[in-house]
Amino acid sequence: MLNDVKKEVPFDEETFAHGGMRVFAVATNVETGKPAYFEKGKTDFPFDEAVRASASLPLASVPVVLDGQPYLDGGCSCPIALNWALNEGFEKIVVITTRQKGFRKAMPGQKMVDLYDDFYSDKPLFLADMLTQELRYNTLMDQLDELEADGRICCVRPQEPITIGRFEGDENKLLDLYNRGHREGREALDKVQGYLET
């Protein structure tokens, strides 16, 4: 799918490749269950392969092999790389979430637990990630709220709940959500700028 998007949406790869900004893609190692943070320009493979791995959904995607290791979506082990950024010593951290403030994930039902077990029983460390991801996400959201209230980080979140699923196929609904995100993102610019300048 990523290759299809690259054909349809113009992207200035030259500027991206040679720009001075550090860019990372987070993917989960299916063998170890641990997140890997791939930095643009510092891998032995094309960075877009790391991006592809970081967006490869479990259950729906074949793992992407990087340096001989299988990887899936970074969110399986690291929903938001907040603690990584704090540990790296970043002084200013802007977090953009896909859910509104106060959103918390429900724990998976038995059918989902069984499905994860069917797919990943031979990968016990990754399976453990899948079975605890909601709990880790919710704990991280509590931490985000605290750090935001203390002014340590800046969060940009949807103003209203997202009402479509991750496999939505209705192009009109997707376009409406895109336009909403674009509008709300522009509205948040003053907030972000103010945070970065303090």
Describe each region flagged by the PLM:
Residues 1-198:
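Patatin-like phospholipase
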